[in-house]
């Protein structure tokens, strides 16, 4: 939390498999530790989201054998060969639940309080009365632990249950942060995540999209529709390979700090230094975008303020491009007198820029400029 506060971050997600939340989708064991963490975070003006959904449940939950007693009402069993992302089924599951159980995430603890133990989970049925149990659990977490929101990793929750969850969360902040793994492959149904989750988008606040998205190989149109969240009114973040900051700035996206490449704070600082919350974003698709690159493979998004603007460009082409950005001053709102590359940590070296002489962008490379009146 101290690190997050030092970087100016305002939300922290507590993932399962950690000392504060050791068992997946069951944050009801280390409750005192979790509560103390949430209270300390609040002191630092940071909200805490906890990993909590219903797709799978842990063998450590108090109700695990009550689930078994209900037959197939709660536990989802495979039909035919089935499929599991994990190779093999833990012996504990087959011993107590039979060969048709569907294994899910598992964590083997190598140190700490639970050293030598394992968090073994199994898939449960969607749209069962377990959804009611989940909502009551969420209400308890808000009233007794003080969490600000939840982090869900994909989901089997339907629209009605997510809407109910949102109403419960509204008591204390209301954030739902959702991660999506790329479902456009056979074992995941070869489907678009945006299509899959369209009905719950109105209740989400933040997206993290996600494993399996090779950002540099995707078209700008695909990124807009399937990754950015913009058509649904949601903010998104990148994951795979640490993301690509210059692509991200075309869509107001950033990497997520603390996962993979730790460069997200450099973009956060750029946003703070520029005052991006007071700007108007005009994406490369916007009819009133004041910047034209003159090259269809080089896209530019502009963040406008009175007397200054950020111009964010990325070359989607396979070859270097030489461009001379054409700026429509009537759309920009001022006549730019200076242009420079802001220094952005490990992402971009600072320096002067001459828009009249043109700029070179390497293949799959980007640049961020700031212009001022």
Over which residues does each language-model region extend?
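Active-site-proximal substrate-binding groove within the catalytic cores of carbohydrate-active enzymes
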Residues: 159, 166-346, 363-367
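The substrate-binding groove and active-site-proximal loops of carbohydrate-active enzymes
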Residues: 15-31, 115-132, 145-156
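A cross-family glycoside hydrolase active-site/sugar-binding cleft signature
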Residues: 14-15, 49-53, 151, 177-181, ...
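Active-site-proximal loop/turn and secondary-structure-junction residues that shape catalytic pockets
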Residues: 18, 54-58, 155-158, 182-184
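Active-site-adjacent "subsite" loops/lids of carbohydrate-active enzymes
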Residues: 50, 54-145
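Active-site and adjacent substrate-binding regions of carbohydrate-active enzymes
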Residues: 126-182
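Aromatic- and glycine-enriched glycan-recognition loops and surfaces
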Residues: 1-88, 132
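C-terminal beta-strand-rich structural cap/linker in extracellular carbohydrate-active enzymes
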Residues: 350-373
């Amino acid at each position: 939390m101290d690190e997050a506060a030092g970087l100016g971050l305002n939300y922290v997600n507590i993932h399962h498999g950690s000392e504060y939340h050791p068992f997946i989708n069951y944050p009801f064991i280390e409750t005192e530790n979790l509560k103390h963490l949430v209270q300390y975070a609040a002191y630092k003006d940071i909200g805490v989201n906890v990993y909590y959904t219903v797709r799978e449940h842990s063998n450590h939950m108090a109700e695990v054998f009550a689930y078994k007693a209900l037959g197939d009402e709660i536990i989802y069993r495979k039909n035919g060969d089935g499929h599991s992302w994990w190779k093999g089924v833990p012996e504990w599951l087959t011993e107590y639940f039979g060969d048709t159980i569907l294994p899910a995430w598992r964590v083997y603890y190598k140190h700490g309080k639970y050293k030598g133990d394992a968090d073994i989970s199994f898939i449960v049925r969607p749209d069962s009365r377990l959804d009611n149990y989940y909502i009551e659990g969420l209400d308890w977490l808000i009233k007794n632990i003080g969490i600000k929101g939840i982090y869900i990793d994909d989901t089997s929750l339907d629209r009605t249950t997510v809407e109910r969850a949102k109403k419960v969360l509204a008591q204390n902040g209301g954030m739902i942060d959702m991660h999506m793994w790329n479902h456009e492959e056979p074992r995941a149904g070869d489907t678009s995540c945006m299509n899959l989750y369209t009905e719950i988008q109105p209740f989400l606040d933040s997206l993290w999209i996600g494993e399996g998205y090779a950002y540099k190989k995707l078209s700008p149109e695909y990124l807009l529709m399937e990754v950015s969240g913009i058509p649904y009114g949601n903010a998104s973040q990148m994951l795979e390979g640490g993301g690509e900051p210059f692509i991200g700035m075309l869509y107001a996206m950033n990497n997520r700090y603390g996962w993979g490449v730790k460069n997200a704070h450099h973009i956060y600082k750029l946003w703070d230094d520029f005052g991006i919350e007071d700007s108007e974003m005009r994406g490369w698709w916007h009819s009133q975008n004041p910047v034209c690159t003159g090259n269809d493979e080089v896209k530019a998004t502009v963040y406008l303020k009175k007397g200054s603007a950020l111009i964010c460009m990325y070359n989607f082409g396979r070859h270097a491009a030489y461009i001379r950005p054409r700026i429509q001053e009537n759309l920009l709102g001022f006549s730019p007198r200076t242009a420079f590359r802001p220094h952005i940590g490990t992402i971009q070296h600072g320096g002067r820029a001459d828009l009249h002489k043109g700029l070179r962008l390497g293949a799959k490379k980007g640049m961020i400029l700031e212009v001022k009146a």
